[in-house]
Curated annotation (Swiss-Prot):
The lineage of its organism: Bacteria, Pseudomonadati, Pseudomonadota, Gammaproteobacteria, Enterobacterales. Pfam families: PmbA_TldD_1st, PmbA_TldD_2nd, PmbA_TldD_3rd. NCBIfam families: PRK11040.1. GO terms for biological process: proteolysis. It is found in: Cytoplasm. InterPro entries: Metalloprtase-TldD/E_C, Metalloprtase-TldD/E_cen_dom, Metalloprtase-TldD/E_N, PmbA, TldD/PmbA_N, TldD/PmbA_sf. Coiled coil: none annotated. It comes from the Bacteria. It comes from Buchnera aphidicola subsp. Baizongia pistaciae (strain Bp). Its main location: cytoplasm. One of its GO terms (molecular function) is metallopeptidase activity. Gene3D superfamilies: PmbA/TldD superfamily. This is Metalloprotease PmbA homolog. Keywords: Cytoplasm, Hydrolase, Metalloprotease, Protease. It is an enzyme of class 3 (hydrolase).
Length: 448
């Protein structure tokens, strides 16, 4: 892991490269945007207490974008040498000459940029480690999983990953910034077997700070318990029933909403929510806030991929859709202003109407399906039609009765959004969208 002093030196060096390229652009009378990313990390995979693989990775990526007379050119390279930089710049100048003009292309408005407004979001935490320590963390997770129960019969692997990323950004409007982040994760996936039935499941922990990770023992134990709970699963009859999306997969439910309000889909008129701005999309008690400046946040950023300053905002307020997710280009296409979402979303918090945990939601549902894993990609953002394979548990009188698999759940997202009855307080913070478990009044289940 790189020391803080090394990171500071690296950041200063990258900013100098960015400034040099921007000066090249100015000398050629073009507007430019420059991004440099340097990544350094290690991935350790353990299987059945043996080292399966150790991968050290270190890479650079330089991207130069040039705008001239509404024409755009972009070239990337992994070589940061002086000669390569000039070759890349010459290439991008050639591309922009032959590009078709587009009145909507160009740098963001300067007043939207995070110039002199960048704050410390506590995203970098170095860790004094050696490879043997990383191996032991992964081994410990798997070891604890096997100790949990004799029915844990195999392992698909236990992993430890660490990554340091430094990102330098600059453009011709006077913005040059650089920051570094760390990311650590550990995971374990095991197979349980009993009476001829075998089931797999996994658990993981992820954090900016190594000290905030779950203990590897807990990761292993959780993976074992989850795999064991799926043994001797049954199929369901085809029916309509109430359902709960567990907090572990709740982000997958709301990521469909994020895609539907993405500016690219809006200006291309390829979203089922095309005419839904400032209308009721969710129940009137549901609010979605974007909080990009959370300390140590997994998706925290002071500025987006174009340098536009990020801001705390309500995406949905009391069920009403308040904004699209726009970058500069999509905003200009629909005569609006960038929302600072070039590159994605930044820490969504789903705020509901309940202080209940999962057990209380199960009692509220009484009878229905608890969904713990989703399979496949059967979602159309254009129509809202939704169909995915699912794994979970059948619930009767508020109590989990048995595991179920080989089922498909389906519906239309527009209706599913409005069918949300409650959202629990069991918030999963391991994703860019943080939500508790979601109770839906009904969903179509296809089984036998």
């Amino acid at each position: 892991m790189m020391k803080l002093s090394d990171i500071t030196t690296q950041e200063n060096d990258l900013k100098k490269i960015v400034e040099y390229i921007l000066n090249l652009a100015a000398n050629h009378s073009v507007f430019s945007e420059v991004v440099i990313e340097k990544n350094c990390g290690v991935d350790v995979l353990i299987r059945k207490n043996s080292v399966n693989s150790i991968e050290f990775n270190k890479n650079n990526i330089l991207t130069i974008t040039v705008y001239k007379n509404n024409r755009k050119g972009m070239v990337s390279s992994t070589d940061l040498s002086f000669k390569s930089i000039h070759n890349v710049f010459s290439s991008v100048m050639g591309i922009v000459f032959y590009s078709s003009p587009d009145e909507f292309s160009g740098l963001p408005d300067r007043k939207l940029l995070a110039i002199n407004k960048v704050k410390d979001l506590d995203l970098y935490h170095d860790w004094d480690w050696n490879i043997n320590h990383a191996i032991e963390i992964a081994k410990l997770s798997e070891r604890e999983a096997f100790k949990e129960d004799k029915r844990i019969i195999n392992s698909e692997g236990s992993c430890f990953n660490s990554l340091v990323r430094t990102r330098a950004f600059g453009n011709s409007l006077g913005m040059i910034e650089c920051y570094s982040t760390t990311l650590y994760s550990t995971s374990c996936c095991v197979i349980a077997g009993d009476n001829g039935d075998m089931q797999r499941d996994f658990s993981f922990s992820v954090s900016r700070d190594m000290n905030d990770l779950n203990l590897p023992e807990k990761v292993g134990q959780d993976s074992a318990k989850k795999a064991l709970s799926r043994l001797n699963s049954k199929k369901l009859l085809t029916m309509k029933t109430s359902a709960i999306f567990s907090s572990e997969i709740a982000f997958e439910f709301f990521i469909n909403f994020a895609k539907a309000i993405n500016g690219n889909n809006v200006y291309q008129k390829s979203t089922f929510l095309l005419h839904s701005l400032n209308t009721q999309v969710f129940p009137n008690w549901l609010t979605i806030e974007e909080r990009p400046h959370i300390k140590k946040g997994l998706s925290s950023k002071c500025f987006d991929a174009e340098g536009v300053m990020t801001k705390t905002k309500k995406i949905v307020n009391k069920g009403i859709l308040k904004t699209w997710l726009l970058d500069t280009y999509s905003a200009r296409k629909i005569n609006l202003v960038s929302t600072g979402n070039s590159g994605g979303i930044h820490n969504w918090l789903i705020l509901g109407n309940s202080n209940e945990g999962l057990q209380s939601l199960l009692k509220s549902m009484n009878t229905g399906l608890l969904i713990t894993e989703l399979l496949g990609q059967g979602v159309s953002i254009t129509t809202g039609n939704y169909s995915r394979g699912a794994v979970g548990f059948w619930v009767d009188q508020g109590v989990i009765k048995y595991p179920v698999n080989e089922i498909t759940i389906s519906g239309n997202l527009k209706n599913m959004f409005k069918d949300i009855v409650s959202i629990g307080n069991d918030i999963d913070k391991r994703h860019s969208i943080q939500s508790g478990s979601i109770l839906l009044s009904q969903i179509q289940v296809s089984g036998i």
